[in-house]
A protein has these predicted regions:
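NTP-dependent small-molecule kinase module
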Residues: 2-9, 32-34, 148-215
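Hydrophobic anchor at the beta1->P-loop junction of P-loop NTPases
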Residues: 18
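P-loop (Walker A) phosphate-binding loop of NTP-binding proteins
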Residues: 21
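Conserved lysine of the Walker
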Residues: 26
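Hydrophobic positions on the alpha1 helix immediately C-terminal to the Walker A/P-loop
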Residues: 29
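ATP-dependent small-molecule kinase phosphotransfer cores
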Residues: 42-121, 125-129
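A glycine- and Lys/Arg-enriched "phosphate-lid" helix/loop adjacent to the NTP-binding pocket
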Residues: 112-175
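Phosphopantetheine-dependent thiolation modules in NRPS/PKS and related acyl-activating systems
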Residues: 211-245, 249, 254, 259-299
Length: 299
């Protein structure tokens, strides 16, 4: 099996996804992750795939409620779900990421591939082509539990205690999820134990990601201090230097500048893609800090 070639998104936010069997603990991990990131000041969007548009459709409900699927071509349902994921990704997830939000998704495109392959459609190429339009998660968690554990958890829900579950399919799905995770740069999490243990593993990976996206306030303070003092740092060559920041770093830099300059930036100055060089920092400082940087030569 080849890897899904998902598209690296251009947003300043984070995309975190959770996939796995029904009963693997996705809902609990999403709840705990959201609470953890909210305490850290993240603006969140919680979502799921496929969306209710598909889940409420007649073909989806009929297929899910029947034990006998002989009269249904699963590929048609998968195509419906895939088109829904494209629409949802382009018009819900990407805009949120570009607004700097952290998006947490219950299931993702990986689930579409896993379900298709688990049902025997292993030669279909169309799903790989569609994947190239789907934003790649910053963290893709695959929660792994033994099939019997997952089924027992599902059966413990009052509303689903009598639900028909195709056990053979669940074993195939688990195998596909594990393989997709390994080939797509996902993070396999053992979710068989208590939720506290599972979340500790999830939180560790989140913290590792956040640590790679440092707060820029210290660097901003040092740079502006040198600029205000008329240091040689203000030479044109220095001002032309690329700050070397990714989109998240630029957003952090803007927020730090607003706080440092005690100013509320105009919307046009909040665009992180306009903040590339030290000279761009100077221009903002001159605009919002009055005479403190008036003698600094901007590029």
């Amino acid at each position: 099996m080849e890897a899904l070639n998902l598209k690296v998104h251009d947003g300043t936010g984070l995309l975190i996804t959770f996939c796995g069997l029904d009963g693997c603990g996705k809902s609990t991990m999403i709840e705990k992750t959201a609470a953890y990131l909210e305490r850290k000041g993240h603006s969140l969007l919680l979502t799921r795939q496929p969306t209710d548009f598909v889940r409420r459709s007649d073909i989806f409900r009929t297929y899910m409620d029947l034990e006998d699927h002989d009269n249904y071509e699963y590929r048609s349902l998968s195509l419906l779900a895939a088109s829904d994921r494209v629409q949802h990704s382009c018009h819900v997830i990407l805009p949120a990421l570009r607004e700097g939000k952290t998006v947490i998704s219950d299931r993702y495109f990986y689930s579409c591939l896993a379900n298709l392959r688990a049902r025997g459609y292993r030669e279909d190429r169309w799903i790989y082509e569609i994947a190239e339009t789907i934003p790649k998660p910053d963290l893709a968690f695959f929660l792994d539990v033994p099939v019997k554990t997952a089924v027992a958890r599902v059966r413990s829900r009052a509303a689903e205690k009598d639900r028909y579950i195709d056990m053979a399919l669940q074993y195939e799905l688990r195998k596909e999820y594990r393989e997709i995770c390994g080939r797509s740069g996902g993070i396999l999490i053992n979710a068989e134990g208590p939720w506290e243990q599972t979340f500790a593993a999830v939180r560790e990976k989140i913290d590792e990601l956040l640590a790679r996206r440092p707060d820029m306030s210290g660097q901003v303070l040092a740079l502006l201090g040198e600029l205000a003092a008329g240091s040689s740092v203000c030479r044109e060559s220095r001002l032309s230097e690329d700050l070397g920041l990714d989109s998240f770093g630029r957003v952090s830099l803007i927020l730090a500048l607003e706080e440092l300059l005690d100013a509320e930036f105009e919307e046009s100055d909040l665009d992180p893609f306009q903040l590339v060089t030290a000279g761009d920092v100077v221009r903002l400082a001159q605009k919002y800090a009055g005479g403190a940087y008036e003698n600094t030569a901007a590029v």
